[in-house]
Structure formats: structure tokens, C-alpha cells
Design a protein with these regions (language model features):
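Short, intrinsically disordered or compositionally biased N-terminal tails of bacterial proteins
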Residues: 1-15
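N-terminal helix-turn-helix DNA-binding core of bacterial DNA-binding proteins
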Residues: 22-60
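Basic, amphipathic "hinge/linker" alpha-helix immediately C-terminal to the N-terminal HTH DNA-binding motif
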Residues: 32, 84-106
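Basic amphipathic alpha-helical segments that dock to polyanions
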Residues: 65, 69-75
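Acidic, aliphatic-rich amphipathic alpha-helical segments
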Residues: 96-174, 221-251
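Low-complexity, glycine/alanine/valine/leucine- and proline-rich hydrophobic stretches
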Residues: 149-207
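C-terminal interaction segments
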Residues: 182-251
Length: 251
């Protein structure tokens, strides 16, 4: 017996079963497991290594993340390849997996339009910073390295998350540091975490957050003025909101 094939079959069988041949039911056996849509979100966003995926989904245990990745591979949604150095692997979407893009985008659009999102229970400064790293217009930067220091106020009590971090920006790439990288800081961002999340989601204009003193920028004047234009915001920031009579419109 092929043990590798048997292992893949066992992973598929571990998924929830609806007992129906309907294509929606069968697809949900793969897609609707807890955490799976979020894992797919990260793969679509460009995370390919285990630690990269886990960094943006810190509440999933590492064993459960490993299990979900095995299940997705067994279902033909992703493929994994060993890295040249070490024992870690890279995960990439297959053609089958890439077809989930429309479903993931539709979930994000629905969530942006119809749900109340920013509250103390779902604030996550780490996810916010990783998204800012991904969605910064590097081509708008000056032709040198720019260092932006973020310090967040209003971090919910009892939550373990970043309160200070550094965004390292260059035209060739960007990174987030959770400890002082030792570079001279060009722009300081002192922000209320909820306000910064609302700016990112398109619910609060950056200039209005500054006017309300929820975000304060200091540093090199020319870079401070340019900083808001570097932020591309969430992919879903332009999704139209519901009519005012709907509860989700009361933000």
C-alpha cells in the first residue's frame, strides 16, 4: 500500500462531511473548515512559508495549522515543496486552489459591506502592520531607505500584540521589525489602534484621524507630508457601504 497516498486519504477523510453530492456541499467540505478561508487569504496575499502564514493568524495553534495545510494539500488545493535549506516547506496554490480567489474576495466584500469589524475583540496590530507592509506604494518612496516607527495606543488589555514596531521601506522591498533595527527613524506614527484599523479599512479618512488627534505624525517634514499617500489601504476599502437604514451602516 502507498503510505503517502493513504496519508492523503486520511487527511481528506478528516474533513467535515455533509453527506450530499451537491457541489456546494462537497466544496464546503474543503473550504468551510475553521481557519481554512483565512489560510487561503494568506496564500493569496503572498505568504508561502509556515511561519509567514502563522504570523498573520496567531490564534491558530501550530499543530492545527500544519493539519489544515496537510488537508488542503490532500484535497489538491495547494502543493508543498521542500526549501533548499532546512526542513521547512513552501506552500503554493494549485490551479484548483487559485479558483478559490473569487470565493475569498466575495467573503471579504460581504464582510466589508455588512459587518461591524473594528472592536476590541478583533483588533490585531500584527495583522495590521503586515497588511501595511504588503500594501505600501513602494514606487512613491524617495530613492533611499525610509524608516517609520509605529507606536499604538488603545491596545486592548490582556491582548498580547505589538505596541511598537518599525516599518522599513525601500523601493526594492519592505519589512516589519518588532525590535529596534538601529536605523535613524524618518517618520513617527503615534496612533490609536482602532483608528488606524478604521483608516486602513476605509472607514475613517487619514486626515480626519489626524484632526481628531487619533493619529499623530512627526519626523522629517517632507516625508511626514508624503506618508499618507504611501498607504494603499485594504483591498476592500472601496467597497460601497449599505444604505443607512441597515444596522451594519451604523458604524
Amino acid at each position: 500500500m502507498n503510505l503517502s497516498r493513504a496519508g492523503r486519504a486520511a487527511n481528506v477523510c478528516a474533513m467535515a462531511r455533509f453527506g450530499q453530492f451537491c457541489p456546494i456541499a462537497v466544496a464546503c467540505e474543503v473550504f468551510a473548515e475553521r481557519w481554512t478561508p483565512i489560510i487561503l487569504r494568506e496564500l493569496f496575499a503572498g505568504s508561502h512559508r509556515f511561519n509567514e502564514i502563522h504570523r498573520c493568524i496567531p490564534l491558530i495553534s501550530r499543530p492545527l495549522l500544519a493539519r489544515r495545510l496537510r488537508e488542503l494539500e490532500a484535497a489538491g488545493v495547494i502543493r508543498s515543496t521542500p526549501q533548499q535549506k532546512g526542513k521547512s516547506r513552501e506552500y503554493h496554490l494549485t490551479e484548483s486552489g487559485r479558483e478559490f480567489r473569487a470565493a475569498v474576495d466575495a467573503l471579504g466584500t460581504w464582510g466589508q459591506r455588512w459587518t461591524l469589524r473594528v472592536n476590541p475583540e478583533n483588533l490585531d496590530s500584527g495583522l495590521l502592520m503586515w497588511n501595511i507592509r504588503r500594501r505600501t506604494a513602494l514606487e512613491r518612496l524617495p530613492p533611499r531607505r525610509v524608516v517609520v516607527e509605529f507606536e499604538f495606543r488603545g491596545v486592548p488589555a490582556g491582548r498580547s500584540m505589538l505596541k511598537k514596531c518599525w516599518l522599513i521601506l525601500e523601493r526594492t522591498g519592505s519589512d516589519v521589525c518588532v525590535s529596534d533595527p538601529g536605523f535613524e527613524v524618518d517618520v513617527y506614527v503615534d496612533a490609536d489602534l482602532a483608528a488606524m484599523a478604521n483608516v486602513w479599512l476605509g472607514d475613517l479618512p487619514f486626515a480626519e484621524a489626524v484632526r481628531q488627534k487619533k493619529i499623530k505624525l512627526t519626523g522629517v517634514p517632507a516625508l511626514v507630508r508624503a506618508f499618507p499617500d504611501w498607504l494603499l489601504l485594504s483591498h476592500f476599502a472601496r467597497v460601497p457601504r449599505p444604505p443607512a437604514e441597515f444596522p451594519a451602516a451604523q458604524r
